[in-house]
Amino acid sequence: MPNLQQTASQSQHHLYPPHLRPHHHHQQQQHHQQQQQQQHTHHQQQQQHHSDFPLPDGWDIAKDFDGKTYYIDHINKKTTWLDPRDCYTKPQTFEDCVGDELPMGWEESYDPNIGPYYINHLAQSTQLEDPRQEWKTVQEQMLSDYLSAAQDQLENKREMLDVKQQRLLWAQEEYNHLKLAASRSSLCSSSSSMSRHDPELLRADLMLARERVHQLKQELTHITNDISYTERGMNTLYSVGEKINARENGCYDIAEVQAIREEMLKVHKSLVSGEKVREELMRSLVQIKNELGRQQISEENSDLASPFDRVCVASQTDLCGSSGDNLNGGARFAEMAKTKLQYAEWRKHIKKLQQQLADHVERIEPGQLESDKDRILLIQEKEKLLNDLNSISLKSRSEEEKRVIHQTRHKLEEDLKEAYEANNTCVANRLRFHEEKQLLLDKLQEALKSTKLLEERLKSFSSESTFSISSGSSLGSLSTASSKSALSFTDIYIDPFAVDSPIDVVDLRRRSQRLFQQHQQQRLLPVHPVLQQQQSAEVTLSPRSSLSMETPPASPMKYNAGADQTPQALKEEPTYANALPAPPAYTAPPPVPISGVRARPYDLDSTVLDCMMLEAKLQKLNMGTPLNLAAAPLSPISEKPSLLDLPQEMLSRSSSTSNTRSVSAAVSNESVAGDSGVFEASRAHLPRKELAQVQIGLKYLKQEGVLVVSLERANNLLALWTASADNSQVYLRAALLPNSLTSIRTKALGDFQKPFFNDTFAVPITLDKLLTKSLQVTVVTMTGQKEEIIGTVQISMAEFNPEDSTLKWYNVLSSKFIPSFESLDIPSTSAAAAAAAVAASNAPSSGNNREESSDESTITSSQTSTLTRNQAPCMELQEQITAELLELGPLNEPECSDDDDEDEEEELDDKQLVSDVGLMNSSGMLDAYLQNMKQEFADKETNTDRAYLPEKSRGQSQLMDDRPVKRSQTFTPSAAVSKNRYNCRLNRSDSDSAMHCGVAPHTFQRGAAERRSLRFHTKAPKSVTKLHHTHIPRTSLDLELDLQAQHSKLYFLNDQIAKLQNLKEVLQKACENKDPLVAAWAIENEEFQRLVARADPAKCPEERQLQKLLMKTAKEIHKLRKTKVPKGCPDLVSFKEKITFFTRKGLSVPELPSEFTLPEANPIEEEEEEEDEDEFYNSPETAIAINTALVASSNRNKNLSEHPHRSTSGAVPKLPAPVATPAATPAATPAATPVATPAATPVVATAAQPEAKPAAAPIPVASNDAEQQRFDYVVDRNYGVEV
């Protein structure tokens, strides 16, 4: 091999050889001959490789120090990266390429930060675009078309500005007329006969005219800001198009792409820090607004309490007990199975709504809704101008003024008629699609709310404790300030603060059409003014209105249903099932809630609702008789009587308007809830008797290691006992479950109304074991030798505080609520018998080897005692929950994504969002529950000892390792069975139905090597199951748009921060000076209220979580829509969203008006000056100027309609100079900007070049002149280009 240094001494080493630049004559002839030879043997050469051909004479192969192969031409003493044999194996042009081939001289390479890029060795250049695709041309055409449409939209905004200015001129003229009349009336006030007008009416009209002028000035400012925003966005798009067209091939090389990427990351860091500053400023504004509200209220009436001072009593009581604790094991089992089934259905419903929204995005053009809104607003402005002209009195006008006004009216009527005809044909379909999208969004929001409620309910089940009131769990951070190496589409173009609350365009169009129809009717058939006023003053009272009821109802009950409700809604009981909107199982999605009737499950008693749900499910499964709700207990959390049985006259007085969950006083005066003083007073005259309760005291002695249980007294046990209490007695029995070998009992008493037991027991137990137990107290009656359990109380010791002693009243759950309760035929009532029953039920047993009670009694029918039968399913259930929750995925897990880093970040958010919440196999839970509840009805040929649990739950549960596997007697009893691999689930027969009934994750494969994998298929890792989408090509235009979008966001963020700082300073000064005008503006201004509502710390945590869920759902919808793009095809909708981002309205920060009111009219003013001013505003020249402006605006629109298409060939035309407006230059000063942002000009620095330091000034938009100074060009030997 020739020496590389010798060949490099006479040529440029590591550069492209000169024979790839202008060739010599003999080299051109040789190259031409090679082309002709290659055309004859093209088909054969495609099947050959480099190894099939030897290197030409004088050529050699070498490798660089980094392993890159290059070729040496010893004849010409040059080096090259090109293989000289490519002329035999590769096509010469793109037309000759087959499939994914690249022609000779092209190479595809990969950069870990940028991705794939392409090298043109012939032209010594690199580019980001794939040369085989024409996506760049399509993008340029789309950009040109959008700029043409945006120009029309801008013209509509400017025409709207002209109409608004005309309205302001007429309003100012009317105001000056009224001011002059009020001045003359004040001068002639000494004699009422000399006054032609009532002074009081003149002052009222003057006040209305002044407010109207002020309102029009504010609207004019908003339109001016909109125009300046749109103009800036269009100028940015024009500059992007010109910059791309100015390139030699319209592409950035790889070094420029790398520099742009680094610049985007720097700007993104500045955006993250700026957003934190903006949020802090908005929180400060919330505090200042609240302080101004307090000052205003204190000035008006110091005796009234401030509405901002609220006291939350949610954490002042020990809230314990819930429906889950009051229900025994079987009911709790079925209730959780049903809740998880609802949760699964809601997850499916959310996925379906997301898919429908992804489909709707393709039907609605991005930016088209904004254009339709501008058209409708323009029509509405012209209607208002026409109404203003119609309201002008013509009595004091000259003939010339009357003629101008009539011409202007006629012109406006013709324009409105043409606009309505055009809009009715082209806007109707788009608005229909938009209305459907809004309906889907509303359904999605309701679905997320319901799912969040179900998640909280599942958390209470999974923790084996009662419901608790908390401040809300952390959802994790959705900030994009992570250490990701690249920015995704959603990071740049989806921003929760980027867009204001949208205007309801559908309602706006309907209102505009209604005004037009009324105007047409008035022209055809004039209406008497008095009748017209009566028609407009009609008020429709809602059935939920406070005018038609004594007090607002607490919840939409069946008694106060209005006429607008459907018959189905009238028949529905206010149970938990219809209070919490849930989709029907495996059917269509839920219907839209009835307007005016909003479900509030917190207004109803949770225990009653849970039992009603259980009753409905049990009746559906034919598992028992209907439950008796006459003795429905009260939960310790909400000791409020159920509203189901209240009559109408009491229902209207027993409701609460508070937004918190009201808790009334307990039944007994010794109740903790009653003594706490934070509950509402108990309702005295209830149409039902009181419910059964027991008073239990608990205290733990740490030194002795003993739990002291005091069973003090009970109240109204007759509610549980329907038989005669003459010859019966009652006592209490308690045990610590599970695995308790001893139980305690009180003495038997004959008083069922208020028995006083006063028995204290000491149970030795360690503290760590105590916290894992639950205390179960049962109420047992004795009639002769027969005992019967009539109620039970279950207390979780997990929330017991060993440092303190408690004495509380607990509600007793009647045995009638659970069909599994049965009578106990026990001859003796000793405590040893009950302890033996507990021990027999919890001890391990297998086959016929079963421990039985050896005491005075045995349990009949080979069943466990009622105590342990009610408790064991609950413990097995908890173990199954713990195992299931570890293997289930989060809510709304994204199925596909192009950005792995974004997926990882959202996975962390999901895990924090729905921690300890999962989805169990509900059908398996119900099957297990059926086997527990109907154990005695099992087939006698099948020995069903105990309910079967899946293998994955048994593997993680230590308490159930020693229990036998449920088997059929038809299998060989002596066969050795290993629980770790024996996972056959038996049904009632020994046929193939005994196999696993789950749905296989793959199709059946006969003769598969691993047949056992078809039984229980483990969940594949996420990296395998995730659908990896094909690479969507990116172009230089995409990259430049992303960079300019980041700069635009930073520019407007700096502008918002400057305005917020200015607003904060003004409001602070007004708060210190107690300025009533500024305080009134801060409280009454709707725009300011919407701004501070975004960062109000008093907002409900659930609302914040819902907003984050909606934001996350928007990202998932974008991912779903990307998966619908065909393989290898560009995403047209995403590119349209990119270019519409620049003309989309951002977050508007209100500005304090310079003058809150116009100056009052001075009645002592000289009359001559007023007459001169009156002559100026009433002169016909002013009216003619207004008419001229209208005609000019109409001619401009006519020219635009005659030339709808503009020439877009060549360079993109420059936007004409914008109209000079006061808000054309946003007030973003460097001094008022606290965000430290990096320099706008990135430099590809060498090793010795220091990095650019951050500057305090905002990053300006990159200009065309700064492009030449962006890079220092050097020669890169790896890429072979100048960078």
UniProtKB/Swiss-Prot annotation:
<keyword id="KW-0963">Cytoplasm</keyword>
<keyword id="KW-0472">Membrane</keyword>
<dbReference type="GO" id="GO:0060253">
    <property type="term" value="P:negative regulation of glial cell proliferation"/>
</dbReference>
<feature type="compositionally biased region" description="Polar residues">
    <location>
        <begin position="537"/>
        <end position="549"/>
    </location>
</feature>
<feature type="compositionally biased region" description="Polar residues">
    <location>
        <begin position="1"/>
        <end position="13"/>
    </location>
</feature>
<dbReference type="GO" id="GO:0035332">
    <property type="term" value="P:positive regulation of hippo signaling"/>
</dbReference>
<comment type="similarity">
    <text>Belongs to the WWC family. KIBRA subfamily.</text>
</comment>
<keyword id="KW-0175">Coiled coil</keyword>
<keyword id="KW-0677">Repeat</keyword>
<feature type="region of interest" description="Disordered">
    <location>
        <begin position="537"/>
        <end position="559"/>
    </location>
</feature>
<protein>
    <recommendedName>
        <fullName>Protein kibra</fullName>
    </recommendedName>
</protein>
<dbReference type="GO" id="GO:0106037">
    <property type="term" value="C:apicomedial cortex"/>
</dbReference>
<dbReference type="InterPro" id="IPR036020">
    <property type="entry name" value="WW_dom_sf"/>
</dbReference>
<dbReference type="GO" id="GO:0019900">
    <property type="term" value="F:kinase binding"/>
</dbReference>
<feature type="region of interest" description="Disordered">
    <location>
        <begin position="1197"/>
        <end position="1263"/>
    </location>
</feature>
<dbReference type="InterPro" id="IPR000008">
    <property type="entry name" value="C2_dom"/>
</dbReference>
<dbReference type="GO" id="GO:0060090">
    <property type="term" value="F:molecular adaptor activity"/>
</dbReference>
<dbReference type="InterPro" id="IPR001202">
    <property type="entry name" value="WW_dom"/>
</dbReference>
<comment type="subunit">
    <text>Forms a complex with Mer and Ex. Interacts (via domain WW 1) with Ex (via RXPPXY motif). Interacts with Mer, Sav, Hpo and Wts.</text>
</comment>
<keyword id="KW-1003">Cell membrane</keyword>
<keyword id="KW-0597">Phosphoprotein</keyword>
<dbReference type="GO" id="GO:0045463">
    <property type="term" value="P:R8 cell development"/>
</dbReference>
<dbReference type="GO" id="GO:0045464">
    <property type="term" value="P:R8 cell fate specification"/>
</dbReference>
<dbReference type="GO" id="GO:0006355">
    <property type="term" value="P:regulation of DNA-templated transcription"/>
</dbReference>
<feature type="region of interest" description="Disordered">
    <location>
        <begin position="1"/>
        <end position="59"/>
    </location>
</feature>
<dbReference type="GO" id="GO:0098592">
    <property type="term" value="C:cytoplasmic side of apical plasma membrane"/>
</dbReference>
<feature type="compositionally biased region" description="Low complexity">
    <location>
        <begin position="1217"/>
        <end position="1262"/>
    </location>
</feature>
<dbReference type="InterPro" id="IPR035892">
    <property type="entry name" value="C2_domain_sf"/>
</dbReference>
<feature type="region of interest" description="Disordered">
    <location>
        <begin position="887"/>
        <end position="910"/>
    </location>
</feature>
<dbReference type="InterPro" id="IPR051105">
    <property type="entry name" value="WWC/KIBRA_Hippo_Reg"/>
</dbReference>
<dbReference type="Pfam" id="PF00168">
    <property type="entry name" value="C2"/>
</dbReference>
<keyword id="KW-0804">Transcription</keyword>
<feature type="domain" description="C2">
    <location>
        <begin position="690"/>
        <end position="810"/>
    </location>
</feature>
<feature type="region of interest" description="Disordered">
    <location>
        <begin position="941"/>
        <end position="969"/>
    </location>
</feature>
<keyword id="KW-0805">Transcription regulation</keyword>
<dbReference type="GO" id="GO:0036375">
    <property type="term" value="C:Kibra-Ex-Mer complex"/>
</dbReference>
<feature type="compositionally biased region" description="Low complexity">
    <location>
        <begin position="30"/>
        <end position="48"/>
    </location>
</feature>
<feature type="region of interest" description="Disordered">
    <location>
        <begin position="840"/>
        <end position="871"/>
    </location>
</feature>
<feature type="compositionally biased region" description="Low complexity">
    <location>
        <begin position="856"/>
        <end position="868"/>
    </location>
</feature>
<feature type="compositionally biased region" description="Acidic residues">
    <location>
        <begin position="895"/>
        <end position="909"/>
    </location>
</feature>
<feature type="coiled-coil region">
    <location>
        <begin position="200"/>
        <end position="228"/>
    </location>
</feature>
<dbReference type="GO" id="GO:0005911">
    <property type="term" value="C:cell-cell junction"/>
</dbReference>
